[in-house]
Structures are given as C-alpha cells and as structure tokens.
From Swiss-Prot:
Pfam family, one: FUN14
Protein name: FUN14 domain-containing protein 2
Role of this protein: Binds directly and specifically 1,2-Diacyl-sn-glycero-3-phospho-(1'-myo-inositol-3',4',5'-bisphosphate) (PIP3) leading to the recruitment of PIP3 to mitochondria and may play a role in the regulation of the platelet activation via AKT/GSK3B/cGMP signaling pathways. May act as transcription factor that regulates SREBP1 (isoform SREBP-1C) expression in order to modulate triglyceride (TG) homeostasis in hepatocytes.
Cytoplasmic topological intervals: 1-42, 91-126
Length: 151
C-alpha cells in the first residue's frame, strides 16, 4: 500500500476510533499504560510507595474533613428534630414509621437472597487484579490514607 505521487494511498483502510477505545479502558490503564503490567516494572519501589502514600494521605485527609462535616450536619439535624418533637412543633406517627421499617426489612431480605450482579463482580475482579499487580502502590495508599485520617 504505497503512496502514489499525489500523496494518496492505494487500497482501503479502516478508521480506528481512539476515543471509543479509550472510553472502554479502566482509569488505571490510562494512568499506567496499556497492558504495561504491574507498575513495579515502570517505577522504583520508593517511587511507588511515595505515589501511593501521598495520594492516600490526601484522600484520607479530605475524607476526614468531609466526614466530620457530614457527621456534624446529620447529628445537628437529629438534634433539631428531637428538639422540635419535644417542644411540640412536629408530631411523629410512630405506627407509620414502624410499618415503613417492616417494609424496608422485607425488601432487604428479598435482595439478600438474590445474586450479585455480574457488573459488580467484574468491577470487583478488576480492582482485585489491580491490587495484586500493584501491591506497593496499594500498600502505600492505605498507609497514607490512615495517616491522612489521623492528621
């Protein structure tokens, strides 16, 4: 399939849509490269631990701050609801609450008996595969995450 004198190619070619191909790839393949294997082959042990530790610490720190804010909001909301109930501003229909709780329990029992969807299983298998191939990065991440939660 050589080019003729005007720059046109002889023969038929199939166009490859790279945008569609990259959409189907997991995020870690985009980060570490296509079928590059474990990141241990690309980076040194220290680099992997630093990458995992720093990202883990940042995630843990943000998780801690957001968690505190969420806990404060939920706790404050419950406190205000109890205060409003005690002072008579709102009246709770406990029979209706009990009926709804029983209905929710039944739905949970039904869902418990069903199998895990295949999409969830495949995602879990991808995560397990990533963790097995990148033990140092994952270990650094979890260590950093715990440090971030503590700071």
């Amino acid at each position: 399939m050589a080019a003729n004198s005007q720059g046109n190619f002889d023969g038929k070619f199939e166009a490859l849509d790279l945008a569609e191909l990259t959409k189907k790839q997991p995020w870690w393949r985009k980060l570490f490269g296509q079928e590059s294997g474990p990141s241990a082959e690309k980076y040194s042990v220290a680099t992997q631990l630093v990458i995992g530790g720093v990202t883990g610490w940042c995630t843990g720190f943000v998780f801690q701050k957001v968690g505190k804010l969420a806990a404060t909001a939920v706790g404050g909301g419950f406190f205000l609801l109890q205060l409003a109930n005690h002072t008579g501003y709102i009246k709770v229909d406990w029979q209706r609450v009990e009926k709804d709780m029983k209905k929710a329990k039944e739905q949970l029992k039904i869902r418990k008996n069903k199998q895990i969807p295949t999409e969830v299983k495949s995602k879990a298998e991808e995560v397990v595969s990533f963790v097995k191939k990148n033990v140092l990065v994952t270990g650094g991440f979890f260590g950093g995450f715990l440090l971030g939660m503590a700071s």
